[in-house]
C-alpha cells in the first residue's frame, strides 16, 4: 500500500515514475489494494485560442504549469464487481456519475476489461469552476491510481489516449511539470528543460472570487478576431521564443479568454487595473476563470496586495500563495 501521508510533491513524482515502468516491473505492486494520488492544480501561463474547428472545438496553444495546490484522490478496490462509488466530503454535489473521475473509471474498464469494484474518495482543495483544472486533474490521478492497482498495465501512450477521451486538458496532467498543449488541448509535449527549470519554484498568488465561471459561457463570448495571435504559427513562435530564452516569463504571459472575462465581470477589471497601477503587477485569468493569479516578484511584500484583494472582493474569497512545480 502507498501511504497517504507522503508529501504531495514527492508522491506526484513517484506516481509518474511508476506509470512509465515496464509491465514486468509493475508486477511488484500487484498486492496493492489502495493508493492515494495527489492531483495538482494548473494555471495557464499562455493561452491563445484560434478558429473553431469542424468538431466544434477551438484550435489552441497553451502553456500549462502545475502549482503546489492539490486535491487528494484515494482509489480503493471495492468488493462489488463492476461497481463504482465516489465520495467527496464537503462537495456532495459532485459525487455522482458526471464526475470526470467516475467517467475515467468507466473508460478504463472499457479499455482493460477489468471489472473490479472501485471506490473513490476525493478530498478537494482546488476550487471548482476556477480554470485550475481540478476536475481533470482528479480524473487523471484516478487513472494513475487505477494503473498502479491493475495487473494490466497501460503504456504511457495508452494513458494519453484514454485521458483525452475524458477531457481536452486531461492529458496535460500526465506530465509532472510544465507542458505545451495544442489541438483542442489533447496534444501535449513537455516544456523544454531549461525553461521548465527556470520557472520551477516561482511564487504565485492565486485568488478567486466567490463565484465560478462557466467555460462554455466564456468561450461563447470569445471573438477570435480579438486575439493577438490569430494564426497557429504566431502562437508557436511566441512559445518557442520563451523556451529559447528570447522572451521572459512575464512577457510570455497572455490569455485570450481574459478578454470576454474582463468585459463581463467588471469587478475583475477594476481590481486588475489597481494591481497594475499601484503595485506594478501583471495579473491574469487562468483558463476561462474565475481564478486569477500573478507572479510574485522576488522580495515583494505581498501582504498589502492580499488586503487590497480582500477589501475589493470580500473575505469569503479563495486566496492562497503557491509555487510552480
Language model regions located:
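Glycine-rich beta-strand-to-loop/alpha-helix junction loops that act as flexible
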Residues: 134-135, 285-290
Amino acid at each position: 500500500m502507498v501511504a497517504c501521508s507522503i508529501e504531495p510533491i514527492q508522491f506526484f513524482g513517484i506516481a509518474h515514475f511508476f506509470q512509465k515502468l515496464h509491465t514486468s516491473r509493475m508486477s511488484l505492486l500487484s498486492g496493492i489494494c489502495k493508493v492515494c494520488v495527489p492531483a495538482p492544480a494548473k494555471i495557464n501561463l499562455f493561452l491563445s485560442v484560434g478558429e473553431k474547428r469542424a468538431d466544434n472545438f477551438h484550435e489552441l496553444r497553451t502553456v500549462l504549469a502545475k502549482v503546489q495546490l492539490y486535491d487528494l484522490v484515494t482509489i480503493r478496490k471495492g468488493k462489488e464487481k463492476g461497481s463504482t462509488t465516489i465520495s467527496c466530503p464537503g462537495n456532495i454535489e459532485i459525487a455522482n456519475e458526471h464526475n470526470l473521475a467516475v467517467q475515467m473509471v468507466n473508460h478504463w474498464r472499457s479499455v482493460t476489461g477489468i471489472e473490479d469494484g472501485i471506490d473513490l474518495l476525493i478530498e478537494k482543495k482546488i476550487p471548482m469552476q476556477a480554470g485550475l483544472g481540478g476536475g481533470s486533474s482528479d480524473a487523471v490521478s484516478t487513472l494513475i491510481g487505477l494503473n498502479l492497482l491493475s495487473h494490466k498495465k497501460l503504456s504511457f501512450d495508452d494513458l494519453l489516449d484514454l485521458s483525452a477521451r475524458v477531457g481536452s486538458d486531461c492529458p496535460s496532467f500526465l506530465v509532472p511539470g510544465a507542458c505545451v498543449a495544442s489541438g483542442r488541448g489533447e496534444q501535449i509535449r513537455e516544456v523544454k528543460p531549461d525553461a521548465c527549470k527556470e520557472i520551477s519554484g516561482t511564487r504565485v498568488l492565486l485568488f478567486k472570487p466567490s463565484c465560478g465561471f462557466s467555460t462554455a459561457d466564456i468561450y461563447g463570448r470569445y471573438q477570435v478576431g480579438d486575439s493577438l495571435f490569430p494564426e497557429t504559427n504566431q502562437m508557436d513562435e511566441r512559445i518557442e521564443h520563451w523556451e529559447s530564452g528570447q522572451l521572459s516569463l512575464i512577457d510570455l504571459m497572455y490569455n485570450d479568454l481574459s478578454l470576454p472575462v474582463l468585459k463581463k465581470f467588471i469587478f475583475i477589471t477594476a481590481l486588475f487595473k489597481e494591481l497594475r497601477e499601484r503595485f506594478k503587477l501583471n495579473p491574469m485569468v487562468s483558463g476561462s476563470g474565475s481564478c486569477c493569479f500573478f507572479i510574485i516578484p522576488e522580495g515583494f511584500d505581498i501582504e498589502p496586495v492580499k488586503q487590497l484583494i480582500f477589501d475589493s472582493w470580500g473575505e469569503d474569497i479563495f486566496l492562497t500563495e503557491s509555487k510552480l512545480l
